[in-house]
Every structure is written in C-alpha cells, then in structure tokens.
C-alpha cells in the first residue's frame, strides 16, 4: 500500500524522491513520517499538536491498510528511519480531519489535519513549519522532502521550481483545479514519487504545498502536483483552534 492515488491509471512508481540527495541531518525539523510498520506517508508539523498531510492517505484507512485511526504512529525528529538516533518522538494520532471539499476522484482539496494524542516537545529537531504569508509565485525554488515507502532510509531533499498555471494545465489537461500547483522539471528526471505523499513543499521558508499526485516518477512533461496550502489558511487555522 502506498499513500498514493492518481486520478488516471498510475504508472509503476519507485516510491522515492528521484534525483534528490540526502538532506543535511535534521535540517527539515517539521518533516513527519506517518508510520504503520513502514513509512507510508509524509506530513508536516504545524504546531505542538497538529500535523498537515494529504487527505488521500485516508484511503489506507478504509482499504484496511490501517485497521483503526490509533494505529497511525506520527514520527517526528527522524532522519534515518531505520536507526534510533536519539532525536525522535513517536506519538500516536488522535484524530484525522479531512477537508470537507476533498474529492477522491479529482483529488481536489487533497489536504487533511491530524491531531496528535499528546503535544510534541519542540526543539531544534522537532519544529513547526510556518504557514505561508501569501501564495508563492511561478519560478520560486522550493524544497520537497521525504523517504518514500521503501528506500532510501535517510531523508531525501530535492529543489524544484514552481511552474506557471498554464504549464501545469498543459501537463495535465482538465485535471488541475485552482487548489493545485505544479512544481518540477518538464524535461523529467527529478520528481517526488508517491511514497512522499502528504509531505512538505517549502518555498522561502514557508509551507506552500502538500505532495498530492502526479503520473509516475520524473516523467517528461509530468511535473509533481501539490495541494496549494495558501488557499486553505482559514480552514487550517479554524480547525486547529476548535481542536
């Protein structure tokens, strides 16, 4: 099982960031691994008690990959997910709040909040990502990060440029909504694969994207598609405030 749904038939995927390299250790302190015996999804810490991820990971909940919500372990402060390094905090999830407009067919509003069963301890290894002050513009270089579902076991990072709405639409005609942004290289070779789903795309130090979908890995003219976080600020803030 992968934290992945593509709106068209998925091509075979490698489940890792393609063309990336190992992040400097603990350089992405907001990075979360959602763990159920293996890293099945990424996420982003927003506060002591809340994590942002992709709504489509709930397909795992109903498909039986995860027998109940409390089975999801939220892993913070990780770098090598196979080795205890002394910086980790493992906290069970308490509840999932999927965006009410999420559409599993189109993947529109592919965004979800996860409340932790207890607050995380914030330190230099575990620190929330800032939400965006405004939407990011085309050409901005952003960083995506994740482990994928199988390999590698050390956190991978990759810098990708935000594409224009036109380039995004042309890559995926009639599949892009106003709540999606594309990033990556139209020539292929570098991309986030779906094992990294739900994880962060950081632009100028702010969380602008949630890894959502894309067709295969690093294919020519097929950039990665991300949920546009700046469209959801009021929902995120209201939901976190109401607990």
Predicted regions and their residues:
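Cytosolic, low-complexity regulatory segments enriched in Ser/Pro/Gly with interspersed Lys/Arg
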Residues: 1-11
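Extracellular trypsin-like serine protease catalytic domains
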Residues: 9-17, 31-35, 140-243
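Conserved H-D interstitial segment of serine endopeptidase catalytic domains
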Residues: 11, 51-54, 58-104, 158, ...
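Extracellular/periplasmic catalytic domains that process cell-envelope and extracellular macromolecules
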Residues: 23-27, 45, 66-68, 104-107, ...
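A short, Trp-centered hydrophobic/proline-enriched beta-strand micro-motif
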Residues: 24-36, 75
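Conserved hydrophobic/aromatic beta-strand scaffold that supports enzyme active sites
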Residues: 31, 50-52, 88, 111-113, ...
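A conserved glycine-rich beta-strand in the N-terminal activation segment of trypsin-fold
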Residues: 31-48, 106-107
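Active-site substrate-binding loop(s) of clan PA
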Residues: 61-63, 85, 97-103, 119-152, ...
């Amino acid at each position: 099982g992968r934290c992945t749904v593509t709106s068209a038939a998925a091509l075979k995927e490698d489940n890792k960031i393609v063309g990336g390299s190992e992040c400097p250790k603990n350089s992405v302190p907001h990075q979360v691994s959602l763990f159920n015996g293996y890293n099945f999804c990424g996420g982003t810490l927003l506060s002591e008690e809340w994590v942002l991820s992709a709504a489509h990971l709930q397909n795992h909940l109903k498909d039986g990959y995860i027998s109940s919500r409390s089975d999801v372990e939220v892993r913070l402060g990780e770098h090598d997910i196979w080795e205890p390094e002394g910086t980790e905090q493992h906290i069970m999830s308490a509840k999932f709040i999927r965006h009410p407009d999420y559409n599993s067919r189109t993947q529109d509003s592919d965004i979800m909040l996860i409340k932790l069963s207890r607050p995380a301890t914030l330190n230099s290894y575990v620190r929330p990502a800032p939400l965006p002050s405004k939407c990011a513009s085309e050409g901005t270089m952003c960083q995506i990060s994740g482990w994928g579902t199988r390999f590698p076991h050390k956190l991978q990072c990759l810098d990708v440029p935000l594409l224009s709405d036109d380039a995004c639409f042309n890559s995926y005609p009639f599949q892009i909504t106003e709540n999606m942004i594309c990033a990556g290289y139209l020539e292929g070779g570098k991309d986030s694969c779906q094992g990294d789903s739900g994880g962060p795309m950081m632009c100028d130090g702010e969380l602008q994207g949630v890894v959502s979908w894309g067709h295969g890995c690093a294919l020519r003219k097929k950039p990665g598609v991300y949920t546009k976080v700046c469209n959801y600020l009021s929902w995120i803030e209201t939901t976190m405030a109401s607990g």
